[in-house]
Amino acid sequence: MKYVKVQIINKSTIELLEDAKKGEKINLDLINQVDQTNILNTITTNQKLAWEKELSAQFINQQNELIKNFEIEIIKLKTMLNDKEQALLLKTKLELQNQFQKQIENYINEINKLKLTNKELEITNQKQLESSLKLQRNEFEEKINQQNLTIEKLKIQQARSSIWAVAKKGNELEKWCENQYESYADSFENCQFTRYKTEINLLDENDFPNEKADYIFSFFGEKTNKIPFLSICCEMKSEFNDSKHKSKNKDHISKLVRDAKRANCKYAFLISELELETENDIQVRLMPTLESGVEVYLVRPMFFILMLKLFYKLAKKLFALNRFQSVELIDKNKLNEQFKQLKDNFLTKTFLEIEKVCKSNLVDIETLEKAVVKLRVRNERVLDQLLNKWTKKIDSFDLQLTKKITNNY
């Protein structure tokens, strides 16, 4: 019998592979050309979705379980850590207590040993011990006095130079001042800070040996100007603290005046570390020059830049006045008179105020120094009491030893 050939498309569809008539039959057992790919794809897709869903659920469950276990483990570890920390602290505390107790016992044993071994020596050498103790006491008091004097000197030096001492360390005063100016150079418009020998074209070092200043500060007013509107001759002076022949600030004034005149400077700064320990020292002041035509100012290094700025501001004001007023209306003498008035209003009043403040501060310093003396006397009194106390204890200790030895016999 002949059967019609067919193939299965899916679970609900069959496709005829040849023409068929009414009454012809289909043998389902003989269908061998089924499109297995479609069936397998369908089955595979469904299974894959089911597996993915199941795996996703399993993964979430496992993840939650792992998180839960991890949190439990963290709690356990924290508990263990706290327990171990407490145990370690307790152990350390006990060890330190034991060590401290052992040290105390060792000290007690050492003291007892010293007492036992030194009994006879202390009895027989009592006078020698007293003499030695007295000598040590005198030496100790002398050292304390010397140290107190040294400390006071260092305090005075530190109070007067603490602003620039660190920056100056390892450098000479000239280099320090040059570095200070370079640090503030942007504040000095149309200005120069040059070596003295360069400014006056002193090319030969043998010219004026030891007779030249260090620097010249020049204010030109405008960049196009070649002649400075204001010039200040600057000289730096310093010396070692242990110098045998210490010079004074006034010893350098006449030379500085000559240097200033040689460079056509009406003003001069003596930036000095000399006489720092002088009583009633004012950090910035006008020095007497016997109408030399040059104004010389003693300037401590920490006020060097401030003084330059002060003179720079004054010169800048006068330059502006000279620039905006007609020369036909104001002659040179009047301009000089205006500058003198401006200088008197600013500079003279400033120095008077500085002197007033310094004198007030010096009164406070004197009060503090008196307080230091009182503290030193109190310190010496306490030291004397303590030394006498221990001297008496030693005397008492020897007497007790003598009594014990006498009783033993």
Curated annotation (Swiss-Prot):
Top-rank taxon: Bacteria
Pfam family, one: DUF2130
InterPro entries: DUF2130 (IPR019219)
UniProt-recorded name of the protein: Uncharacterized protein MG148
Protein species of origin: Mycoplasma genitalium (strain ATCC 33530 / DSM 19775 / NCTC 10195 / G37) (Mycoplasmoides genitalium)
